[in-house]
Structures are given as C-alpha cells and as structure tokens.
C-alpha cells in the first residue's frame, strides 16, 4: 500500500525523502522554503510536510510514583482488559500505544466500563479495525495486516483491489 501511494505521489511531482531528518526550514526572500536535511542536502520547495509520528503523552502523569509500568516509548503497558501493572489502574487510548484512532479508544473505553462496572470482562478486539487515509489516491484497510495475519493464522490469502471513481469509467 505504501509503495502504491509513494508511486502515485511521485508521479504527481511530490518528492518523498525517507530516513532523513529535517535539520531546519526557513522562508527565503524569494518566498520559497529552504530546508536542510541530515545528509546535508539543501532543498527548495513551495511546501514541506514533515511526518514525525506520535508518542504517548505520559511524561507528567506520575506513573512511576504509582508503580505503573511503561514500555520504551513511555506507553502504558496493559493486559487484554486494559489493566496496567497496578491491578486497580486501567489505561485506554493513545497512552497505551495499541491503535491510535479515536473510535478504537472509544471501543476500549466501552470494554473497560463493561469489565469494571458491569463485572462482565470484555477485551477490545483490535483485529478488525477499518482505517482510511485521505490521500490521492485514497487508502482504506480493514482487518489484520498481512504480516499479522500470517503470524496469527499461518497460511493466508491476500486480496487487493484498486478502484477508480465512477466518473472515470
């Protein structure tokens, strides 16, 4: 999927740099953005997009004092019922670094409520999550990645489809 999007964007004149760190950007008198990347290359562009990813925002929550375990990214580690290393503390959403999507966090919260307040243990299902990326071309996925499906199920069939808008047919 990434390769298809990369190819489509490249065909539209978008240059994509991977494994490069942005050292700085400034707007020149000519109105262009002048950027320097970690390999020393200087770039002139009308626009610069920097995709840096996201990290859980847990730094000032007092997790260490509470004895709540975190991983190397400082995400709160949880079991299948969103329980942390402290049996009376639960965590859901982006701070757990499971799936960083609002509908998933809401689902995790609903499972937490069912588990804790209704005494009906329910674990969130992260296997059938639909996603959409609003690029051109648009990207949508549902279910496990191929790698995760092979790991979980062994031999799998993979189906891919590319669609054109009806107006283009």
Show which residues each predicted segment covers:
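Glycine-rich beta-alpha junction loops
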Residues: 49-54, 94-95, 130-138, 162-165
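FAD-site-proximal beta/loop scaffold in flavoenzymes
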Residues: 42-120
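Short, solvent-exposed coil/turn elements at secondary-structure transition points
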Residues: 22, 28, 82, 95, ...
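Short phosphate-binding/catalytic loops that engage adenosine nucleotides
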Residues: 14, 68, 154
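General small-molecule cofactor/ligand-binding pocket signal
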Residues: 15-17, 90, 157-159
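Conserved beta-strand termini and adjacent loop/short-helix elements that scaffold enzyme active sites
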Residues: 19, 73, 159-161
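Structured beta-strand/loop patches that form or line metal/cofactor-binding pockets in enzymes
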Residues: 26, 140-169
């Amino acid at each position: 999927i990434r390769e298809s999007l990369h190819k489509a964007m490249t065909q539209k004149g978008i240059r994509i740099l991977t494994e490069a760190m942005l050292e700085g950007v400034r707007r020149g008198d000519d109105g262009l953005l002048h950027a320097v990347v970690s390999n020393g290359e200087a770039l002139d562009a009308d626009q610069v997009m920097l995709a840096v990813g996201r990290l859980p925002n847990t730094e000032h929550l007092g997790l260490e004092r509470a004895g709540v375990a975190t991983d190397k990214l400082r995400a709160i580690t949880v079991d299948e019922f969103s329980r942390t290393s402290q049996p009376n503390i639960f965590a859901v959403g982006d701070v757990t670094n499971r799936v960083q999507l609002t509908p998933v966090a809401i689902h995790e919260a609903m499972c937490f409520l069912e588990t804790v307040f209704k005494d009906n243990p329910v674990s969130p299902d992260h296997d059938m999550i639909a996603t959409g990326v609003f690029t051109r071309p648009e990207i949508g996925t549902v279910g496990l990645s191929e790698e995760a499906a092979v790991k979980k199920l062994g031999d799998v069939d993979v189906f891919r489809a590319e669609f054109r808008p009806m107006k283009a047919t």
